[in-house]
């Protein structure tokens, strides 16, 4: 008989995952193993466990190259994976836990796998003449890790790999890129500091270039009182060319056993060229008589057509711009540890940046109710220079064994100088080589801003008993701003001094090795940008005018959150429960005014009555026997918020808008039931997103639903592997009719391994039935919008990968 290896064990307060307990194909990567760990999930490119971010380490050192590098390393290098709370540098000096800790997933590397090179080279061909070439090389070492990366593709991928992070994302809806980087780190220990963080020096140089483009369709409805409603449809095509070289160097070192220094220097330059083509139309409809019309139908409508009589505006805009960004950043810190009682540190940074932009606009506008049209040529040149520097001091001290105190004071100064020259012409005779020559006095802008900020923070960790930590915190912020501001006819000098107070408290209770909970409360104040409180009037877009609001006030919020975590090791169950409450006070919303004769909107920021939101969550993960796994992530939200109904045909600046209440009930669920054997893996899944919106004006009520139910199947018949995914994606309740209904989503993948699994030939077919499209939606108490975007799908690609994984030395 062969004993079953448990997936999870405990060693003190450390959770230990055993790689042998997980079904992996030969040659699998580390990320494939980590995805299978109970409770671990990836969101927005980052790893989380029990809804808390994970800091990746290897043999107790930060993983050189960041989280994404685990996709290049073979899973067989891992002897154990340990999940634990890593104490702060101060805690390791004093022996007292100050509560400042990171949740770490530490990969323990098997003997014989260090000081070797790992990597791969990949060549890919994709239908419609797309390609990708990629090369990774990484030296796995505790002392001198290195990383080299090169790629070129026209398959819409931008991959950026540096010593601290990795980005792998779509460029846009379509695109091409080239990128290269080299990264080096040297690690060592100062005598007498082996129990603390290692000294390290890093250097990185990289150069990236990309071209990206996309077409986005959008529909927008701004909420009106019980009058004629309006509905706007638009389409935007954009293109961007970008090149960005950058260099970075970092140093952290113990000069002796009680002093550390750290320095980071980073320099970058970025140049981009952009074009935008916009088409749009708006039409009116009576309440409860909505009928969707596409943009093409609106643009094609002619006098006599029923739709033409309802049209309000149509527009076609073309924009081109060139932009340069320069940035130099240096931060520095010194910390001195005072025996077993605390530490004193000085920290600061200086940043110098500059930006300049030249932009041309060409607008064709139709005001159908006024039976007139116009063409507008615009050009502006914008220049921005900024200097920011900050210096702070921190004193940390333990009052006995149970009370820790931290006092920090930071002083920051910034100087920003922004200027914009603006030219506008309606007469083509004044346009020379596409550039207007008449100065537009209404949109010339300049702003010289000086900001002084002092932030005093007092925080503490109180440990009445070993298992309980109480961590109160209080911040006092004093902000003084001076602005010499000009926009059109507005020419003013303003000085504002603001003070904000931000209290918070965090309670953490480790009831046992397998049970813990935390409770937190935080109160925040947001001061509106000084410029938004000026009475400026931006008429760059004749159809959408933006203004400031001198009556704008501070907004506030407070959030209370509770988390509970429990494990049953023998039953291989991980359970997480969460609840939170958020209250907004005087939040800032957008108030729209509308002229029904021209179809022109005017907007300004305005404080609105506050709302609140309750959120409840359940995360459940269980291994059932040797082969089965059940996972469910469920969240319930109920929220209330307020917005303003649009003011229609009322030019009185003191007009009082009507409040509109939005009530939202939301359910999100991610369910998986999987079977994992050596040769077969099957997963049944269901993803649910449902929101119920209710308004004071019932004609705006809606309940959008998205549900995806399907199956993932993987078959391993060495040297072949086959993967198939089928899902029914269903949407309903959207104003854009094309978004609603069932869509059969599908993809398939087959691979062939040879040369002792060093070579991999694979064929991937995406969206076999050509049903996919990218949708997005946003609903507020004053507006709702829905959009769709193009991206690469319905393709086949053939790729070849060669891996040069090192093998452990035989003893």
Question: What does each of the following model-derived ranges do?
Answer:
Residues 43-91, 104-111:
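Periplasmic plug
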Residues 12-14, 51-53, 76-78, 100-104, ...:
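Extracytoplasmic
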Residues 62, 66-67, 87-129, 144-751, ...:
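Primarily recognizes Gram-negative and organellar outer-membrane beta-barrels
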Residues 1-23, 42-44, 51, 84-85, ...:
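Short, acidic, small-residue-rich periplasmic hinge/interaction motif at the N-terminus
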Residues 14-36, 50, 57-66, 122-127, ...:
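Short, polar/charged loop or turn motifs at beta-strand boundaries
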């Amino acid at each position: 008989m062969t004993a079953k290896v448990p997936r999870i064990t405990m060693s003190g307060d450390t959770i230990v995952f055993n790689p042998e307990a997980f079904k992996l194909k030969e040659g699998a990567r580390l990320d494939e193993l980590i995805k299978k760990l109970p409770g671990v999930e990836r969101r927005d490119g980052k790893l989380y466990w029990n809804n808390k971010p994970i800091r990746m380490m290897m043999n107790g050192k930060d993983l050189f190259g960041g989280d994404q590098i685990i996709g290049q390393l073979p899973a067989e290098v891992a002897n154990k994976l340990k999940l634990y709370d890593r104490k702060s540098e101060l805690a390791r000096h004093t022996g007292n836990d100050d509560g400042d800790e990171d949740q770490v997933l530490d990969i323990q590397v098997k003997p014989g796998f260090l000081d070797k090179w790992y990597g791969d080279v990949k060549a890919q061909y994709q239908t419609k003449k797309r390609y990708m070439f990629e090369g990774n090389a990484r030296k796995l070492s505790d002392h001198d890790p290195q990383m080299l990366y090169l790629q070129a593709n026209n398959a819409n991928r931008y991959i950026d790999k540096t010593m601290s992070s990795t980005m792998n994302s779509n460029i846009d809806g379509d695109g091409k890129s080239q990128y290269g980087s080299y990264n080096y780190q040297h690690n060592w220990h100062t005598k007498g500091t082996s129990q603390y963080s290692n000294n390290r020096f890093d250097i990185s140089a990289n150069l990236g270039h990309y071209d990206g483009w996309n077409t986005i369709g959008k529909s927008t409805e701004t909420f009106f009182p019980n009058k004629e409603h309006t509905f706007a449809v638009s389409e935007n095509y954009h293109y961007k060319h970008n090149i960005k070289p950058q260099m970075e160097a970092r140093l952290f070192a113990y000069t002796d056993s009680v002093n550390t220094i750290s320095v980071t220097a980073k320099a970058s330059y970025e140049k981009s060229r952009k074009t935008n083509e916009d088409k749009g139309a708006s039409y009116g409809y009576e309440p409860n008589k909505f009928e969707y019309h596409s943009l093409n139908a609106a643009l094609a409508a002619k006098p006599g057509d029923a739709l033409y009589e309802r049209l309000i505006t149509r527009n076609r805009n073309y924009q081109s711009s060139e932009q340069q960004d320069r940035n130099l950043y240096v931060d520095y810190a010194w910390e001195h540890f005072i025996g077993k009682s605390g530490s004193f540190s000085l920290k600061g940074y200086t940043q110098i940046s500059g930006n300049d932009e030249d932009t041309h606009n060409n607008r064709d506008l139709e005001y159908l109710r006024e039976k007139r049209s116009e063409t507008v040529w615009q050009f502006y040149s914008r220049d921005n220079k900024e200097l920011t520097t900050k210096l702070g001091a921190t004193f940390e001290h333990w009052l006995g064994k149970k009370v820790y105190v931290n006092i920090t004071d930071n002083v920051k100064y910034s100087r920003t100088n922004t200027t914009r020259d603006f030219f506008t012409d309606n007469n083509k005779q004044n346009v020379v080589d596409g550039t207007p020559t008449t100065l537009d006095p209404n949109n010339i802008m300049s702003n010289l801003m000086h900001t002084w900020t002092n932030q005093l923070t007092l925080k503490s960790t109180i440990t009445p008993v070993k298992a309980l930590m109480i961590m109160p915190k209080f911040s006092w912020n004093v902000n003084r701003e001076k602005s010499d501001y000009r926009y059109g006819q507005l020419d003013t000098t303003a000085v504002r001094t603001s003070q904000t107070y931000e209290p918070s408290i965090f309670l953490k209770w480790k009831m046992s090795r397998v049970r813990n909970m935390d409770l937190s409360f935080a109160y925040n104040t947001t001061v509106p940008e000084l410029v938004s409180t000026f009475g400026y009037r931006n008429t760059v877009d004749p159809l959408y005018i933006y203004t400031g609001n001198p009556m704008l006030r501070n907004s506030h919020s407070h959030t209370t959150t509770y988390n509970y975590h429990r494990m049953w090791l023998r039953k291989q169950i991980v359970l997480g429960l969460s609840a939170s409450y958020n209250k907004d006070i005087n939040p800032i919303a957008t108030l729209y005014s509308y002229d029904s004769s021209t179809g022109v909107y005017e907007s300004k920021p305005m404080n609105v009555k506050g709302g609140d939101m309750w959120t409840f969550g359940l995360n459940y993960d269980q291994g059932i026997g040797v082969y089965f796994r059940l996972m469910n992530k469920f969240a319930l939200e109920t929220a209330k918020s307020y917005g303003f109904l649009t003011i229609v045909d009322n030019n009185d600046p003191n007009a009082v808008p009507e409040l509109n209440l939005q009530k939202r009930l939301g359910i999100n669920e991610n369910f998986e039931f999987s079977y994992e054997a050596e040769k077969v893996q099957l997963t049944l899944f269901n993803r649910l997103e449902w929101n119920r919106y209710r308004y004071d004006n019932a004609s705006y009520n809606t309940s959008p639903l998205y549900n995806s139910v399907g199956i993932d199947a993987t078959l391993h018949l060495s040297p072949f592997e086959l993967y198939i995914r089928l899902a029914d994606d269903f949407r309903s309740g959207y104003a854009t009719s094309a978004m609603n209904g069932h869509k059969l989503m599908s993809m398939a993948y087959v691979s062939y391994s040879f040369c002792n699994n060093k070579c991999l030939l694979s064929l991937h077919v995406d969206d076999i039935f050509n049903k996919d499209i990218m949708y997005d939606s946003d609903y507020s108490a004053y507006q709702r919008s829905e959009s769709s975007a193009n991206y690469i799908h319905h393709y086949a690609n053939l790729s070849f990968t060669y891996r040069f994984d090192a093998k452990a030395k035989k003893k």
